[in-house]
Amino acid sequence: MSITKEQILDAISEMSVMNIVELISDMEKKFGVSSIIPSSSTSTQNIETAEAKTEFDVLLKSIGGNKVSVIKAVRSATGLGLKEAKDLVESAPTIIKERITQDAAESLKKILNETGAEVEIK
């Protein structure tokens, strides 16, 4: 004689929450499974985000001590005029360049760091 699903469900419905939690834990151990189901959509989104990251933004966080050198570096990198570059630098934290390759972003970060600026790549 076997027990039906309905009989199992009836027995579980009469149990306390703590007993159900213990039952689930015991079942996980017995069958070597986990009740936590990984969300495939979240995993897929994380993979797509990691693969799709081909464009980067360079964020000027702070100017540092040598504002003139930072302005010159920003002018050179962006092609802005003196006033526009000065205004951009003085508005830190701000994005200096958007949607550039990783190599270009790393190069710009290195140049700006050499002038004493604090830079982050996003």
Curated annotation (Swiss-Prot):
Cite a single GO MF annotation.
mRNA binding
- Identify one Gene Ontology CC term for this UniProt entry: cytosolic large ribosomal subunit
Does this entry carry the keyword Disulfide bond? no
Task: Give me any GO biological process, just one.
Answer: translation
Domain of life where this protein originates? Bacteria
Q: Which UniProt keywords apply?
A: Ribonucleoprotein, Ribosomal protein
Question: A Pfam family this protein belongs to?
Answer: Ribosomal_L12_N
Assembly information from the UniProt record: Homodimer. Part of the ribosomal stalk of the 50S ribosomal subunit. Forms a multimeric L10(L12)X complex, where L10 forms an elongated spine to which 2 to 4 L12 dimers bind in a sequential fashion. Binds GTP-bound translation factors.
Q: Which NCBIfam families match?
A: L12
- Functional summary from the UniProt entry: Forms part of the ribosomal stalk which helps the ribosome interact with GTP-bound translation factors. Is thus essential for accurate translation.
What the record says about family reads: Belongs to the bacterial ribosomal protein bL12 family.
Q: Please identify the protein, giving its name as recorded.
A: Large ribosomal subunit protein bL12
